[in-house]
């Protein structure tokens, strides 16, 4: 069969479209994605659509983001004018702005410069859209920051502080009512938000805010929670959510949420809220949520696999940490039975060791004694890198509660000597090494110490001086150049500073340490860690005026090298080196004014008052023997010799 002949040109094109009537039923109906719905391609939750900014609006917020870098306080009138103009631009399109990458950054910055009224106005404009915002990437971040600022406003309202309200403002709702609007909107969907990748973070912040804890972040550091004053209705509402979760969720569901990467954060908040309510209440001491999760007496923890899961799961261990911090003492005994016989294995486990640290902080003397007896068998491994954190916490607990300090200190010393028999004790404990300096072009090697080991040594110096003297002696056995190197290293300098500041430090040790620095004070003073060391030497030389004179003379001789250095100039000012160079006699007088009391005077003044003795009263009558000789008066005062 012959094919139809093809003709060229637009008039005869086969791609010519024809008008076809299509009914509305044939179109695919696009629905709003359901909460928790997963994209089958990206495997991520589908985010609701909140609108987009026009290219001109996006360009505006990109430029504003760069402008806000130079504005750090609201005290400037230009800053206030800029903030007002930003909120005027945002008004009416809040959802589109907070869901934009540039707009969200601008909002996070401008919240720190905004007035309380502006923040409340913005928060109120989101009413009815909180559920959608919590499910978006940028919107959830903005909402977290916004909750932190709302917490500050609530705290001020509760304490009766003056808010920076604006004149002519029409919005009169309190921060309390605004937060409750948000809670009422999210409450029906909490079960779906619990393990949502984005919403779980917002839910955690909201629950802790209701419980009186506000998230605060300074710079790039990790956010921390501070206590604030909140209405009593907030805490009752927070507990009602926890109570509802305990009633409606099965134990298996709670445990599954505990090891979920996102839901675990909310479970931790639930536990905190429940135990804090238990601490406040005088009658109701029940903890139904925690009991269903783990603490019920019906559960045999030795036979319960969930306990092992919580101990060694990266996510679940955080829930167990919160439980260990707050559980009753009777439950700690149950936990001790689980740990007995395997303290060392759990303490060196990369995840379980964090739970063990929380447990040790609450342990009593008998529990610590059992632990130490078990650790004796692994004494050589006590100073392993993986065990240092637990060892530091254990010694810290012994120092705070004043038990087993001698036992543990000797155990650490013997373990270090056994593991490194030919190495100096101080060097062995700090795990000191020399590594190539990445910032140096000549291949210079610098001292590097283990940070946790430094913290352990600091804790070891807080034991009675009779014990810590052995550690100080090992430091002083090093060459002066090595001691100077430790004094200028970021981590180990804290140890040297602590030793110099010890009030009960032996005079011989103090002199030897100061002698090690002789000739290096100027070199030490121009480093960031060393400048603190030289300042602490002022305290260490209170009873050693000759040493103090030698130090200031060495700093004065270095001159501009110290005076105009960023760190050295602070030492120069604290030691008043300029006064020493200009008028040495005045400097000596000023130095003597700071001299501490002599030990003998301290002992005399600390003596108890004399009892059953008659104090001599000064008589107003003239003495009969005004011409008594000096010898007679001295004999009368001191007695017959």
Swiss-Prot record:
Its BP terms in the Gene Ontology are: endonucleolytic cleavage in 5'-ETS of tricistronic rRNA transcript (SSU-rRNA, 5.8S rRNA, LSU-rRNA); endonucleolytic cleavage in ITS1 to separate SSU-rRNA from 5.8S rRNA and LSU-rRNA from tricistronic rRNA transcript (SSU-rRNA, 5.8S rRNA, LSU-rRNA); endonucleolytic cleavage to generate mature 5'-end of SSU-rRNA from (SSU-rRNA, 5.8S rRNA, LSU-rRNA); ribosomal small subunit export from nucleus
Spell out the SUPFAM superfamilies in the cross-references: ARM repeat (SSF48371)
Ranges where the record places region Disordered: 1-39
* Example of a GO cellular component annotation carried by this entry: nucleolus
Q: Could you tell me where the Basic residues compositional bias lies?
A: 1-14
Superkingdom of the source?
Eukaryota
Keywords, alphabetical:
Nucleus, Repeat, Ribosome biogenesis, rRNA processing
Spans of biased composition, class Acidic residues?
A: 20-30
Location in or out of the cell:
Nucleus, Nucleolus
- Chief subcellular location equals nucleus
Pumilio repeats sit at 89-124, 125-160, 185-227, 248-284, 302-337, 338-373, 477-515, 516-553
Extract one GO molecular function annotation from the record.
RNA binding
Q: Any keyword Repeat?
A: yes
Q: Which Pfam families match?
A: PUF_NOP9
* Alphabetical list of InterPro entries matching this protein: ARM-like, ARM-type_fold, NOP9, PUM-HD, Pumilio_RNA-bd_rpt
* Similarity comment: Belongs to the NOP9 family.
Q: What is the role of this chain?
A: RNA-binding nucleolar protein required for pre-rRNA processing. Involved in production of 18S rRNA and assembly of small ribosomal subunit.
The name this protein carries in UniProt is Nucleolar protein 9
**Gene name of the encoded protein:** nop9
């Amino acid at each position: 069969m012959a094919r139809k002949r093809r003709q060229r040109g637009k008039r005869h094109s086969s791609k010519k479209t024809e008008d076809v009537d299509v009914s509305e039923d044939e179109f695919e109906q696009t629905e709003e994605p359901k909460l928790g719905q997963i994209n089958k391609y990206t495997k991520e939750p589908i985010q609701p659509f909140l609108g987009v900014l026009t290219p001109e609006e996006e360009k505006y917020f990109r430029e504003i983001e760069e402008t806000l870098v130079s504005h750090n306080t609201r005290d400037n009138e230009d800053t206030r004018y800029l903030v007002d103009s930003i909120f005027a631009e945002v008004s009416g399109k809040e959802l589109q702005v907070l869901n934009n990458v540039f707009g969200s950054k601008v909002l996070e910055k401008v919240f720190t410069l905004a007035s309380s009224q502006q923040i409340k106005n913005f928060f109120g404009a989101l009413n009815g859209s909180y559920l959608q915002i919590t499910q978006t990437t940028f919107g959830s971040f903005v909402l977290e920051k916004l909750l932190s600022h709302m917490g500050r406003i609530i705290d001020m309202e509760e304490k009766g502080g003056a808010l920076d309200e604006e004149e002519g403002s029409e919005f009169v709702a309190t921060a309390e009512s605004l937060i409750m609007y948000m809670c009422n909107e999210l409450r029906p969907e909490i079960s779906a938000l619990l393990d949502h990748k984005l919403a779980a973070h917002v839910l955690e912040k909201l629950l802790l805010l209701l419980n009186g804890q506000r998230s605060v972040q300074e710079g790039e550091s990790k956010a921390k929670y501070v206590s604030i004053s909140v209405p009593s209705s907030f805490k009752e509402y927070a507990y009602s959510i926890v109570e509802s979760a305990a009633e409606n969720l099965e134990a298996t569901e709670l445990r599954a949420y505990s090891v979920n990467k996102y839901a675990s954060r909310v479970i931790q908040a639930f536990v905190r809220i429940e135990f804090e309510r238990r601490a406040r209440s005088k009658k109701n001491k029940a903890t139904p949520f925690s009991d269903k999760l783990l603490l019920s007496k019906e559960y045999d923890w030795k036979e319960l696999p969930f306990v092992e899961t919580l101990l060694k799961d990266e996510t679940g261990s955080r829930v167990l940490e919160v439980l260990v911090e707050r559980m009753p003492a009777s439950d700690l005994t149950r936990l001790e039975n689980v740990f007995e016989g395997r303290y060392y294995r759990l303490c060196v486990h990369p995840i379980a060791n964090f739970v063990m640290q929380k447990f040790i902080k609450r342990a009593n003397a008998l529990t610590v004694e059992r632990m130490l007896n078990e650790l004796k068998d692994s004494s050589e491994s006590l100073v392993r890198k993986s065990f240092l954190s637990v060892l530091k916490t254990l010694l810290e607990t012994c120092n705070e509660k004043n038990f087993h300090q001698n036992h543990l200190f000797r155990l650490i010393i013997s373990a270090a000597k056994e593991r490194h028999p030919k190495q100096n004790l101080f060097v062995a404990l700090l795990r000191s090494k020399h590594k190539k300096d990445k910032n140096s072009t000549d291949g210079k090697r610098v001292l590097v110490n283990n940070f946790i080991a430094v913290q352990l040594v600091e804790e070891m110096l807080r034991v009675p001086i009779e014990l810590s003297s052995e550690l100080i002696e090992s430091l002083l056995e090093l060459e002066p150049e090595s001691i100077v190197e430790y004094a200028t290293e970021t981590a180990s300098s804290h140890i040297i500073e602590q030793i110099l500041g010890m009030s009960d430090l032996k005079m011989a040790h103090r002199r030897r340490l100061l002698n090690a620095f002789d000739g290096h004070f100027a070199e030490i003073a121009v480093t960031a860690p060393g400048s603190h060391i030289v300042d602490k030497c002022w305290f260490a030389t209170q009873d050693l005026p000759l040493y103090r004179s030698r130090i200031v003379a060495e700093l004065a001789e270095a001159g501009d090298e110290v005076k105009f250095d960023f760190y050295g100039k602070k030492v120069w000012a604290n030691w008043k080196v300029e006064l020493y160079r200009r008028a040495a006699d005045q400097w000596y007088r000023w130095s003597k004014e700071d001299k501490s009391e002599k030990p003998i005077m301290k002992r005399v003044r600390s003596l108890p008052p004399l009892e059953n003795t008659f104090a001599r009263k000064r008589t107003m009558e003239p003495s009969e023997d005004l011409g008594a000789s000096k010898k007679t008066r001295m004999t009368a005062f001191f007695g017959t010799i």
